Amino acid sequence: MSQSYINVIGAGLAGSEAAYQIAKRGIPVKLYEMRGVKATPQHKTSNFAELVCSNSFRGDSLTNAVGLLKEEMRRLDSIIMRAGEAHRVPAGGAMAVDRVGYAEAVTAELENNPLIEVIRGEITEIPNDAITVIATGPLTSDALAEKIHALNGGEGFYFYDAAAPIIDKSTINMDKVYLKSRYDKGEAAYLNCPMTKEEFLAFHEALTTAEEAPLNSFEKEKYFEGCMPIEVMAKRGIKTMLYGPMKPVGLEYPDDYKGPRDGDYKTPYAVVQLRQDNAAGSLYNMVGFQTHLKWGEQKRVFQMIPGLENAEFVRYGVMHRNSYMDSPNLLKQTFQSRANENLFFAGQMTGVEGYVESAASGLVAGINAARLFKGEEAIIFPETTAIGSLPHYVTHTDSKHFQPMNVNFGIIKELEGKRIRDKKERYEAIAERSLKDLEAFLNS
């Protein structure tokens, strides 16, 4: 086995972060990426760390678990966080990025790093020539997926997720929508398409009866809740969407609103939110409207939304299969394979769900691969931190019921002592403890 470099397979968010962290520690990296030679069903470019679903890194507040995770990653010099900050677009209290500018920045930095050799091509075998980080993502090629599944006795898990449509802003009827963030948090960053009860019921009927694109007959539908197709959500009940992406709470009509409304109500019956998708502000995505409807049906149904009667869809929603591993049985908390300590895994394939979480797992795997290379012991981040709670969750949960997981305060170790009843105060206390513990851990 070579002790002159480390392999990183896959240049998505996790692989890009892992490669950066390894090279930062003075170790040569061979970074393999098949895009540019072979396409995936979902990616649009050959850029590293491409965002294929939303352009949002979600909430930025420390009272939000993903906001805490991002702050921890900033303190660990995350390339994904740094590039994201440099290419932010308005999103109220959330962190959203210009997906093209951000991905190009990550790609350029890694390609120009003298310690990183970028190799474009498909890897079909698990390498055994050097310490290796596999971060090929939920869209892992079939050939390599077979080898990874063999580690689990041939048992593979999978689920479907979907991407939301993107709209040309110039085709939105601005007379029927209004600019506002929920509860007026941060700047008014979302375009809101309000619906009356009558409009919502007609929309719900059209959505639940629209024709979906076919699935392969051998693949069972198994959705991750965080990226569920809107039509699947709608079929769960007439009001399900009203507690999800079409929730109207905190999105009151502006004083000068002259469109239709239900009586004297100050809040619409339902709201579809559109979020800026690029730095120029010319594209908007439909928040929470991941879908697997046929493209013609998407146009017909979504043009029923007030303000979108003549909307031009620059990208229709699509759905794809996402594979993930039996991490509780296959991985250590360091993201090392239980069967081979020279093999690391990172990203959504490990069962962490979300852009930020994927990058965080790559950060941990990259640090530990570098430590192993140098003959040092792999580290386990404190379970009191967000970045420590994720690897603990995916490697310690019940394998029989293992599902992909976003970071949340429920998986971070509880505070000691008397429970703080106020949720905001409790989350603030957890965040304060997490950052203190991370600092102490890094200085130990």
From Swiss-Prot:
UniProt keywords, alphabetically: Cytoplasm, FAD, Flavoprotein, Methyltransferase, NAD, NADP, Transferase, tRNA processing
Residues holding FAD: G10, A11, G12, L13, A14, G15
Keyword flag Flavoprotein: yes
Subcellular location: Cytoplasm
GO cellular component entries: cytosol
Known cofactor(s): FAD
Family affiliation: Belongs to the MnmG family. TrmFO subfamily.
Name of the protein described by the UniProt record: Methylenetetrahydrofolate--tRNA-(uracil-5-)-methyltransferase TrmFO
Organism of provenance: Streptococcus uberis (strain ATCC BAA-854 / 0140J)
Lineage of the organism: Bacteria, Bacillati, Bacillota, Bacilli, Lactobacillales
Protein encoded by which gene: trmFO
